[in-house]
UniProtKB/Swiss-Prot annotation:
One of the Pfam families matching this protein, by short name: FAM195
Motif PXDLS motif, residue range(s) on this chain: 79-83
UniProt organism field: Gallus gallus (Chicken)
Name this polypeptide is given: Mapk-regulated corepressor-interacting protein 1
Location(s) in or outside the cell: Nucleus; Cytoplasm, Stress granule
One GO location term (cellular component): cytoplasmic stress granule
Region of interest called Disordered, as start-end residue ranges on this chain: 1-28, 76-96
Alphabetical UniProt keywords: Cytoplasm, Nucleus
GN (gene name): MCRIP1
Composition-biased stretches (Basic and acidic residues): 81-96
InterPro entries registered for this protein in UniProt: MCRIP
Amino acid sequence: MASSPVSRVVYNGKRSGGPRSPGAGSEIFTPAHEENVRFIYEAWQCVERDLRSQMGSERGLVEEYVEKMPNPSLKAFKPVDLSDLKRRNTQDAKKS
């Protein structure tokens, strides 16, 4: 069975201001964690905005990156559904 190439979305642009992360409720996050989450959120918002704005155009700011030589150690990698993981952790915390 041939392994399919790994693809990633690559954003080539500047960061901009955007909405901040909602209150954490009972969870406590470090300022570094909040900064990382904010950076990822803002970067992804820029990617989505650029994808919407380039619809129909031949080439835009957002390109799909395809790995030419995928790492063999990642062959069995299964992505994690972070929403599901958070939901399960929240349910486990309520049981305790």
